[in-house]
Amino acid sequence: VQAVRTGYCTIIVQEQPTARTIALFGINKIREKGERMQKLNFGCGKRFAPGWVNIDFHSVDPLVKRVNLLEGFPFADRSFDVVYSSHVLEHFTPQQAKFLLQEAYRVLKPQGIIRIVVPDLEDLCREYLRVLAQPDSDPEKADRYRWIVIELLDQLVRSETYGEMGKFYLELNQAQTQTKNLDQDQKLKNLRKYVQDRIGEIPNTDPVSLFWSDRFNAFLPKKMGTTLSYAYLRLIAALLPPSLREMVLIQTTIGERHRWMYDTYSLGKLLEQVGFSTVEVTDHQHSNIPQFNDD
């Protein structure tokens, strides 16, 4: 979604080259072409770029500033021309998401643009119903049905790293490696293309290997702080009664679990409540932010 502070904003649901996206963006240019803009990327994770102010709960690179987003953005009012956030809001409660958008509005200059990317609840529901309505005789229905249910629900209920989505990736990768049947191979290729058209990519790495790789990389010097923080949380969790342990562990998977879902209507209304206007839908290829796709 792109939006403007008392101007317009942009909402994008699933910013992938091959996936349907929802974007809301403003119509007016916020800066003359060639003039340097101040740009903020909050909740950036591992996706950040020079020329932007990148902030997140944990820093994975010197270009990323460590900030507790739920305590507010450490910037003065009207500091930025552009605010961007991709796949962040869905990991927070609606109340927390509203606070983050209020902070974004506060730090944006008049006529500044916000561009928000979240999973598209409407598209997921429509695709689920479309697959469900396919005849049972369709040989590809079962696999597609399994995937769309995982895509819709897994990150809402996930209680372990990678969840059912990781298991699906592993099974698909292994099946394609092992099959010698041409018909089965084509069926698996069709399934892979279907999933890629939905999410944009499928990890080729065995989720189990990726799990251990993550833990090895976590001990690199720049990640030691984050590693120790998570180790501390899990140690505390281990000392809690079983009834509370799962709740605490779930709280440590904020980067994986979804706390809410949005569509064009709900996210547009939320942006308007905060103060944004001129909300529109766009895709990953279009933006009124000058040179946005060059970053």
State what each model feature region is.
Residues 82-88, 97:
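A short beta-strand submotif of the Rossmann-like class I SAM-dependent methyltransferase core
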Residues 15-36:
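Short, Lys/Arg-enriched N-terminal segments with co-localized hydrophobic residues
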Residues 96-99, 113-295:
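S-adenosyl-L-methionine-dependent methyltransferase catalytic module, highlighting the catalytic core
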Residues 98-110:
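A short glycine-rich, Lys/Arg-flanked "PGG" loop and its adjoining helix->strand segment in the class I
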Residues 91-92:
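A short His-aromatic
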Residues 70-82:
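A short acidic, Gly/Pro-enriched loop at the edge of an enzyme's catalytic core
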Residues 38-72:
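Class I SAM-dependent methyltransferase SAM/SAH-binding core
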